[in-house]
Structures are given as C-alpha cells and as structure tokens.
C-alpha cells in the first residue's frame, strides 16, 4: 500500500514539474513615447543592445499601436483589454476602480493563473490623484 502511494506521489510530482516547465516566462515592458527608436526596429543611431537582445530572444511587436493620444488611457486599454470608448477612462485623472470597480486587469489574470506579477513605474499612472491599482499586483 505504501509503495503504491509513494509511486502515485512521485508520478503526480513529475506531472506537476512538466506543467511548470511548459509555462512561459512573461516580461512586459511598457514605455511612454518610445517610438521605434531601438536597434531591433532598424534605428541605426540608437544604441540599445539589451533591448535588442530581448527582442531577438523573445517576441517583438511590429504592429502595436497606441490607441489613445494620452498615455494613461492607452495603458488602461492594454491592462483591461477594452478601449476607452467602453471604459470611460479618457484622461490622466481617470480612476480605474471608480470607473470599473470589478475589472480584472491583465496582471490579475496572470496572477490567477499562477504567475507572480510586479510593477515598476506608472503602469496605472500614479499621480494626478491616482494611487495605482494595488489589486492588480
């Protein structure tokens, strides 16, 4: 009986290890006003060896366009998967949880599926009366 239990446990741990190995790492870098001014986008003047190496090893988006003229609503769109016309988040002073209290953001979705999420900088535009979105990280 104990041998069967140990065999089942080892088998289950083996399957868990295989599943964990199949989950890709995700590093999402958001930069305001970057334009394609990096070597990996063909800029001969920009010296961006680290970003170029990340682009070679990972995924580079060639047709990712800003959907709002203001940075905060554009990031809200990316984090929510919904345009400003749907969310009502148009300006720098927009408050995510006031407009969409039950919203599930991209970081929340990743966390729900076993990822560790972190944020550095103004992903949810801290300032202009905003405090970020602690629920997302």
Where are these regions (language model features)?
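Formylglycine-dependent sulfatase
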Residues: 2-4, 18-137
């Amino acid at each position: 009986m104990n041998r069967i239990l140990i065999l089942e446990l080892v088998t289950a741990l083996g399957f868990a290890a295989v599943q964990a190995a199949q989950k890709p790492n995700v590093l999402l870098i958001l930069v305001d006003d970057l334009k394609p001014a990096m070597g990996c986008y063909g800029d001969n003047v920009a010296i961006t060896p680290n970003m170029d190496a990340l682009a070679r090893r990972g995924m580079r988006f060639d047709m990712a366009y800003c959907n709002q003229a203001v940075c905060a609503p554009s990031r809200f769109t990316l984090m929510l998967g919904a345009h400003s016309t749907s969310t009502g988040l148009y300006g720098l002073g927009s408050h995510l949880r006031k407009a969409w209290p039950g919203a599930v953001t991209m970081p929340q979705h990743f966390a729900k599926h076993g990822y560790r999420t972190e944020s550095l900088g103004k992903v949810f535009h801290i300032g202009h009366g905003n405090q970020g979105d602690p629920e997302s990280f």
